[in-house]
Amino acid sequence: MGNGSVKPKHSKHPDGHSGNLTTDALRNKVTELERELRRKDAEIQEREYHLKELREQLSKQTVAIAELTEELQNKCIQLNKLQDVVHMQGGSPLQASPDKVPLEVHRKTSGLVSLHSRRGAKAGVSAEPTTRTYDLNKPPEFSFEKARVRKDSSEKKLITDALNKNQFLKRLDPQQIKDMVECMYGRNYQQGSYIIKQGEPGNHIFVLAEGRLEVFQGEKLLSSIPMWTTFGELAILYNCTRTASVKAITNVKTWALDREVFQNIMRRTAQARDEQYRNFLRSVSLLKNLPEDKLTKIIDCLEVEYYDKGDYIIREGEEGSTFFILAKGKVKVTQSTEGHDQPQLIKTLQKGEYFGEKALISDDVRSANIIAEENDVACLVIDRETFNQTVGTFEELQKYLEGYVANLNRDDEKRHAKRSMSNWKLSKALSLEMIQLKEKVARFSSSSPFQNLEIIATLGVGGFGRVELVKVKNENVAFAMKCIRKKHIVDTKQQEHVYSEKRILEELCSPFIVKLYRTFKDNKYVYMLLEACLGGELWSILRDRGSFDEPTSKFCVACVTEAFDYLHRLGIIYRDLKPENLILDAEGYLKLVDFGFAKKIGSGQKTWTFCGTPEYVAPEVILNKGHDFSVDFWSLGILVYELLTGNPPFSGVDQMMTYNLILKGIEKMDFPRKITRRPEDLIRRLCRQNPTERLGNLKNGINDIKKHRWLNGFNWEGLKARSLPSPLQRELKGPIDHSYFDKYPPEKGMPPDELSGWDKDF
């Protein structure tokens, strides 16, 4: 063809058929593949169903394994405890119920338990008290400006990042981190030197800036520390012994901060925040006449919300239940007016001004728009439900304020006079027997108590010293003598706590609190002559039984609740609840002992010293936010958990891990099956992360605990009258029967004299 085109040839299949056959073959192949695909789909579905069955079986087995593991752990604990007793007896194995060791068995064996069986006992810890009246070497008053150390911006950023990577420190407020960075100072170490030495007391937190560090326990290498990592943080919470050594492998540079400065920063920032919020609230006409304790609760409830320019904080016409205080930035107020299509500007509000206060009284239809005028506007917010639960409804407050406002001119001295009159009435209630005992021991020498007393046995030992069972010579009158080593008190800077314990116990008179009769002192010890409660420690019984049933736990919790009710009415916070600090009298009633961490605080006030037992401390204590009576309610929740299970809910391999578990909270924690629904609800409500939300700290106070469903039907009046039989009833052979206490070896040597004179008024 002239155009050069080529006529196409028809393709032929090798068998001579045309291309149509190829199409048929493809169709057949597709059909075959579709059939195969359906078969595979069916096979996959079958396998998925089988996999689902396996997963369900695995889930059931996992639950069963967890239950068996828990049961095995409990039985191992009980077996170890009983083997300790058998080993000391040199006899054949004891047969006892895994759930309950009879009191008679405890009575026969507890005196034979060696000291190492107390390894499970929890010890309290404490920082130096914030008021160190009796510390003759206390440092000068803290000055933030003097503590600041110059750094360039890049160093500040690196230190800030290092602190924020730490599991504990990242929970602090940004301002607290900023102040820590400002006050950290450089410390250089030569190759081969120790930054931290195992067994020595710690006082500093460090950030590694240059060089190489390695961590040792004994001679064993544990790890190395990366650059810009924080370490040693436990030492800034309280006086503790280092559990490992940190050695410089090269020359190193660190940034350091000591405990005293850290605690002053925490207290300074929190107090400044509270004071600012308090001033804001005092400017609100609705709230300005509320008493301090109510204002403090509102302050603790306030949350911070942030808005950017143009954001509507309140919209006109909407129903609202939230009250706002402007903490930072400016907002504009606009309102619909006749003759205008758009809302018109009414005014501008600035820091310290407030809006929406009517919402605290009743449902409020917003009468205007509130719009952020700039970025990063900060508002302090509280809603009506929170306000009503923690502070009270408007009607309740109105009734309260009528009496309060009528007495606004009454000064603090008159209020304290009223309280002291109340205390005088309490002192009148002292039994004749107690008055006679006080008169008897008042005649003893103040510096030589053992001229008139003889030691019968040791009831307990601790870092402070010992508690001895003593009796009056030639008389059948017994006491417990707490002997506190003066040198230990000075070394740990606990003079204030010892004096506080003395002062507080001297004014108390409750059947749920151990009584103090007299104090003494010599060159080596200060002494407290206490009521002898010889029913034994609750901790020892819990150790031997493994856990308590619900009726026994309820009785224990009720005794503690009555003790807290009495203390809190007097303005006293306890701060060290645990089974180790609960002791039984002859009738099996519990009494609080060891008031070393107790403190009297004013209404609506907070205290700042880190103290307590690690497994029992509340989050606000760990974070140095300041704390009040609500920490006792937190610890009550932990106690309920431990009584029912044998172990506290938060317990890590070291104290810092325990604190991090506490800060994560109890809300998402799975409870063991032995804790039923009602006690679980009580524990969760007592252990709220926010102190203002805790049961006992709401507007109805401790009555909310007494009326909780788990304690429904409990005979509170019988408990207070001591007519309610105790499930822990004891049988004592006489006033010096100490068979319910563990046996302790004699004290090795005598402590050195301590003659600084801090105890002159003891």
Curated annotation (Swiss-Prot):
Main EC class the enzyme belongs to: transferase
Catalytic center residues: D576 (proton acceptor)
Record's subcellular location: Apical cell membrane
Any matching Pfam family: Pkinase
Domain Protein kinase: 453-711
Key words of the record: ATP-binding, Cell membrane, cGMP, cGMP-binding, Coiled coil, Disease variant, Dwarfism, Kinase, Lipoprotein, Membrane, Myristate, Nucleotide-binding, Phosphoprotein, Serine/threonine-protein kinase, Transferase
Catalytic activity: L-seryl-[protein] + ATP = O-phospho-L-seryl-[protein] + ADP + H(+); L-threonyl-[protein] + ATP = O-phospho-L-threonyl-[protein] + ADP + H(+)
Modifications made to the protein after synthesis: Myristoylation mediates membrane localization.
Record-stated family: Belongs to the protein kinase superfamily. AGC Ser/Thr protein kinase family. cGMP subfamily.
Name of this chain's protein: cGMP-dependent protein kinase 2
Record organism: Homo sapiens
Gene: PRKG2
